[in-house]
């Protein structure tokens, strides 16, 4: 007889997914200082020998193919300062979006040069393997499995000037959301699989006024193994969706569903990059 398992997400869950996350920053000038504005979120992914970032189509459309952008990570081990830049002229992109606001699918992928990907890995970034099936079961007899969901992304309104100033610029603190889903509602819109999420703030004091910046962020399905005492012993993850719009009251987020992610992989990414060979032996991440 199956038993429903209730899991409360806390800070211990952030590590398994936040190391996959990245925010995009668009640079500008204000007087003599450089400015950085959050433009959305993405997830580090890989397929065969191809490395890149999966995000929303409308996020990537705001970034010119020849401009240099900032990449801000939300690592489990926080560095003192980040200043990573990516010249998009050295990348290639595919977009699955018709250009109409709020229409789905709204997905995009931008490749990363191997040198950048390797350096990101060396600094703790983890690339989610799009070529692996994700099926999880308890590793020990008698253990139970539970499922919960979490949304990860940049919150634009939480971006603020940092305390430290520098000769050629200033420090910017970029706020990130790791939000446990209070409700998860899969539905179809014009035949496309979407997921609507309402985030719970029971475990955190900050509630954003909007989800600006979260677009392109991952909706994770977390498969949690619990021992006989109900203690979490393992957390596995599956990319369940990619956020792309918020509700009119700014309380809910809608994500592209898993089938739409599978479609861009099959129809756009694999045909565009010969090195994206899902049949090649790969190590799970």
Residue ranges and their predicted role:
Residues 1-27, 276-285:
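Non-cleavable N-terminal signal-anchor transmembrane helices
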Residues 14-116, 154, 176, 182, ...:
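Catalytic histidine site
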Residues 66-72, 121-130, 165-168:
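"Short basic amphipathic alpha-helical interaction patches in structured regions
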Residues 104-128, 146-147:
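Internal, conserved structured core segments that host functional sites
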Residues 129-178:
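Short glycine/Trp-rich loop-beta-loop segment that forms part of the substrate-binding cleft
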Residues 190-206:
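A conserved mid-domain beta-alpha-beta active-site/ligand-binding segment of alpha/beta enzyme cores
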Residues 204, 236-285:
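C-terminal cap/linker of serine protease catalytic domains
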Residues 205-237:
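Catalytic nucleophile loop of clan PA
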């Amino acid at each position: 007889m199956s038993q429903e398992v209730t899991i409360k997400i806390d800070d211990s869950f952030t590590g398994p997914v936040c190391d996959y996350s990245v925010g995009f920053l668009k640079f500008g000038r204000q007087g003599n200082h450089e400015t950085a504005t959050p433009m959305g979120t993405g997830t580090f992914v890989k397929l065969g020998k191809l490395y890149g970032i999966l995000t929303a189509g409308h996020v990537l459309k705001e970034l010119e193919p020849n401009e240099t952008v900032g990449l801000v990570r939300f690592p489990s081990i926080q560095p003192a300062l980040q200043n990573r830049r990516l010249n998009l002229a050295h990348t290639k992109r595919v977009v699955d979006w018709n250009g109409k606001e709020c229409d789905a699918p709204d997905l995009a992928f931008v490749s990363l040069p191997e040198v950048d990907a390797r350096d990101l890995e060396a600094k703790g970034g983890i690339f989610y393997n799009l070529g692996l099936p994700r099926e999880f079961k308890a590793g020990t007899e008698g253990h139970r499995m539970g499922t919960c969901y979490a949304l990860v992304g940049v919150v634009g309104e939480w971006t603020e000037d940092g305390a430290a100033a520098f000769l050629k610029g200033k420090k910017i603190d970029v706020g990130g959301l790791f939000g446990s889903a209070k409700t998860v509602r899969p539905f179809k819109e014009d035949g496309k699989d979407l997921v609507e999420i309402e985030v719970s703030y029971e475990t955190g004091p900050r509630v954003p006024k909007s989800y600006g910046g979260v677009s392109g962020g991952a909706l994770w399905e977390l498969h949690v193994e619990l021992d006989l005492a109900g203690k979490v012993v393992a957390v596995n993850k599956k990319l369940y969706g990619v956020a792309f719009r918020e509700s009119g009251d700014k309380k809910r987020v809608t994500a592209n569903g898993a089938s739409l992610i599978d479609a861009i992989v099959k129809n756009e990414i694999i045909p565009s990059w010969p090195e994206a060979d899902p049949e090649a032996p790969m190590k799970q991440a």
